[in-house]
């Protein structure tokens, strides 16, 4: 069996550690054991090895060099794919074939190694497609469902602040309507034993009396339904009314804030820069016309250089003077 001569080239081109290349070189004697050793890191090459065994059976090819060269081509393709991170499989195949050319000098072994690179290519493509299918994908309706869940949480939290109550309407004997309002309370009654016959009869009589009373109250309530229909509607729909009011209030506040910011006067006043040509710039901005030289009158007085100023007035003592 010819030993591979391109270990230095493979280590230089692929950037592999020497320990990995040494393991790959020592694994040439046992194809199945080497495949199991590299499966955890470089991927599965068992399918490619089986294809090589079908291409180079031992009963047809008594020499094992071509079979081992084909299997080594499978491993070289996996190593190149691991180094290149599987970005371009065609480039990986070219690197694998170059490594086979450098590793083997005989044409039969080179062809077998190239065949191993070619056999590993479809399995690498299938594995890459499987990995891509396992990647999580976002559905098109996911943003809508997220907004809907957020809106439902906001509505639930808003309704939790609203206290519900029970309202009872009763009509007194004088025709006035009495309204009773209380918070809902849930009471769990214990298991009651079977009542005696006399207690059952008394309870039935009480129930019949309550039914008659409720029917009378209901009749009177229907008669006065037109007057208190609005109050009853408010009591039944108080939750939705308060929720709508809260949402509208928030929207109005946001609109007021945006309108105030948009229509506010700018408070920043740019500082004016001082310039020695300030008067000239002011005249240019105001578009003022200069006076012509002919309109200017220059008045000069004749003064002599030897002329001196006159004496100062004498001082007067105000204490000795009469005013």
Curated annotation (Swiss-Prot):
The keyword Iron belongs to this UniProt entry's keyword annotation? no
* Signal sequence coordinates: 1-35
State where the protein is found.
Late endosome membrane; Lysosome membrane; Cell membrane; Golgi apparatus membrane
Regions of this protein lying in the Extracellular compartment: 36-238
Kindly list every residue the record annotates as glycosylated. Answer: 90
Query: Where is the short sequence motif ATG16L1-binding motif located?
Result: 263-281
Membrane topology of this protein: Single-pass type I membrane protein
What ranges does the Cytoplasmic topological domain annotation cover?
Answer: 260-323
Task: State the GO CC annotations.
Answer: Golgi membrane; late endosome; late endosome membrane; lysosomal membrane; lysosome; plasma membrane
What does the record say about PTM? N-glycosylated.
Single Gene Ontology BP term? autophagy
- Taken from the record, one Pfam family name reads BSMAP
Q: Which residues are recorded with the post-translational modification Phosphothreonine?
A: 303
Keywords of this entry: Autophagy, Cell membrane, Endosome, Glycoprotein, Golgi apparatus, Lysosome, Membrane, Phosphoprotein, Signal, Transmembrane, Transmembrane helix
Major localization listed first in the record, in broad terms: membrane
* Spans through the membrane: 239-259
Which protein family is named in the record? Belongs to the TMEM59 family.
Q: What does this protein do?
A: Acts as a regulator of autophagy in response to S.aureus infection by promoting activation of LC3 (MAP1LC3A, MAP1LC3B or MAP1LC3C). Acts by interacting with ATG16L1, leading to promote a functional complex between LC3 and ATG16L1 and promoting LC3 lipidation and subsequent activation of autophagy. Modulates the O-glycosylation and complex N-glycosylation steps occurring during the Golgi maturation of several proteins such as APP, BACE1, SEAP or PRNP. Inhibits APP transport to the cell surface and further shedding.
Domain remark in the UniProt entry: The ATG16L1-binding motif mediates interaction with ATG16L1 and promotes autophagy.
Q: How does it assemble?
A: Interacts with ATG16L1 (via WD repeats).
Cross-referenced PANTHER family, in alphabetical order?
A: TRANSMEMBRANE PROTEIN 59 (PTHR28652:SF3), TRANSMEMBRANE PROTEIN 59-LIKE PROTEIN (PTHR28652)
The name on file for this protein is Transmembrane protein 59
